[in-house]
Amino acid sequence: PREEYTLIIRQYNIGITRLFLGFGEYELTDQSEMLQFSERIRRVPLSVEKQGGKWILFTQDGTKRAAINVEEPALDRWSELLPDPQETLDITLYPDGKREIRLAAYDHFSPPRYDGLPIAFCKRTGKKERATLSFESRPDECFAGTGERFFKMDLSGQTLFLKNQDGQGVNNRRTYKNIPFYLSSRMYGTFYHTCAHSKLSLAGHSTRSVQFLSDQAMLDAFVIAGDAMEEILRGYRDLTGYPSMPPLWSFGVWMSRMTYFSADEVNEICDRMRAEHYPCDVIHLDTGWFRTDWLCEWKFNEERFPDPKGFIQRLKKNGYRVSLWQLPYVAEDAEQIEEAKANEYIAPLTKQQDTDGSNFSALDYAGTIDFTYPKATEWYKGLLKQLLDMGVTCIKTDFGENIHMDAVYKGMKPELLNNLYALLYQKAAYEITKEVTGDGIVWARAAWAGCQRYPLHWGGDSCSSWDGMAGSLKGGLHFGLSGFAFWSHDVPGFHTLPNFMNSIVADDVYMRWTQFGVFTSHIRYHGTNKREPWHYPAIAPLVKKWWKLRYSLIPYIIEQSKLAVESGWPLLQALILHHPEDKLCWHIDDEYYFGNDFLVAPVMNSENRRDIYLPEGQWVNFFTGERLQGGRWLKEVYVPLEEMPVYVRENAVIPIYPEEVNCTDEMDLSKSIALRIDHNYKGFWTK
């Protein structure tokens, strides 16, 4: 039997068209944890007019925004061999009045052999449980974004499963941070407003279409178009929220490992960094500050940290902030377990689940904190508040990609909560941190749409290897193309091989990853074994030199960060953000802009050589002052270990800090000076 549904088309003033269709009980709403409309957004009325075989939707200024084709296709009917195709929905959108974004109305071989449908629902067990939406794809079209994707820059041909899960590294299809948003080389992007598990095929299943399949019988898509990639990303932030500005101290060096075990050990390390003039702002305590390692109870071990408040105050006087690891699960042996179960602060399990005993899985814990339940959220905030009141300045909101799926949550089914959980978790930690300390910040691993409002995020458990470094950079680039401004990664990778915990990191990997970290929005050393530079004596002086460079660059980083939180820019910028028309840039994932002025090409091999692509423009080698014409490749460039290819736009003005400091507390940013990259510039380290 024929079924009829209402397709809603809304137009917003900044080049955004919205399509909504609910197959059943779903209704269009702007009330969502994922949405946070900016003041720039307003709905504009649409008028409808029949023009020939099309219904045209246009705004008051006469700009066409959509065309619905109802004209019968021209036929020369000579054969009845095959049946006519089904009726289809042939709509072309013009979000900014310029770009044509057409639904994939005719993606089939012959009836009934359909590769895709423009809009459809899918039935399982007799119910409408899934929905699909498809847009046309062009043969030369490229795609990027979708979260922290550890793939090459151009995602065309990929079919992605948008389900948050522990990535277990940065060299596979799994990822901690899925974002239901992509960018196209045709200068548009699409945000699918859902937290359901979904599949996104970017001309993968069918080379003729971009197909979105949601495990929810509802479609709510915002199509954003513009003249620049940054404009499209800003439109996405106008829908889902802008990043907040991290505090000054967060842009300094963070030092960590898995893990420090006592106050004495931490004090010794911090004192040595000051004595040997390694600038550093944050010391992070990972899994070893509890009564039992990994047993997260949000309380210090009384024997190893006998006076935590005094310990934190001593570090603060010496210019260090303290960051603490924890997670959103409660262990069976935790002292809070009875309270958490009795009050259903953790979601009750419907059946017992097996554990793998690794401490790296939600299944190893008794339950997941239910952030859909306001009382549970306030209880969790209270656990953090007692730590923040002691002087802790940042909470590492680790995990959050996985939840107990066989559990009953107060406000949402687990199938919908799985992806959204990261947002609710990080929001709670961010809010209480800002309330107590005045600084809005977390150190987070998982993400979904909207999480960019609560910086910052890091890239998860990379391997301390060249492929781990390359995978991290790829993930960071796609993450920046998904609406996030701030991102970091474990320097020099999290785990080692072949022994996960105990293999030694190679000196060149440590050094090259340090250079990469210096030119990232935030730099943190972390991993399964020792990360302090004096454990790598052959390169320790070089590491110190690069750390000092980092602190010199903080005024520039602050300047670019202020720009980022008011626009669509990330700090780590794929080349396509500046050169979307340059086809080469859609295939370069080992270079990036750092802010709008630096071009960075990390070395990721032991041969100390790499090819470097200079985009159009005039470039100056930051370290030597050499001037180079862009629009070309530099082949087989030899780069000594103490150097990294970094170029600056000619005539750029880079604010730098002229004095050496131990930490950002010693900085007075009004003392910053302007480094002019003009004809007089001879190089940063050139005497």
Question: Model segments located where?
Answer:
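Catalytic and substrate-binding clefts that recognize carbohydrates or anionic sugar/phosphate headgroups
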Residues: 2, 8-11, 19-247, 257-258, ...
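Catalytic core of carbohydrate-active enzymes
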Residues: 430-435, 439-440, 447-458, 468-471, ...
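Beta-sheet entry/capping signal
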Residues: 6, 16-18, 180-181, 187-190, ...
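Aromatic- and carboxylate-enriched substrate-binding clefts and catalytic-loop regions
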Residues: 24, 80, 84, 94, ...
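Generic recognition of flexible, low-complexity loop/linker segments
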Residues: 6, 167-170, 177-179, 240-242, ...
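An acidic- and aromatic-residue-enriched active-site/binding cleft used to recognize and process polar
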Residues: 14, 22-24, 53, 60-62, ...
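A conserved hydrophobic secondary-structure block that centers on an alpha-helix together
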Residues: 171-172, 246, 256-306
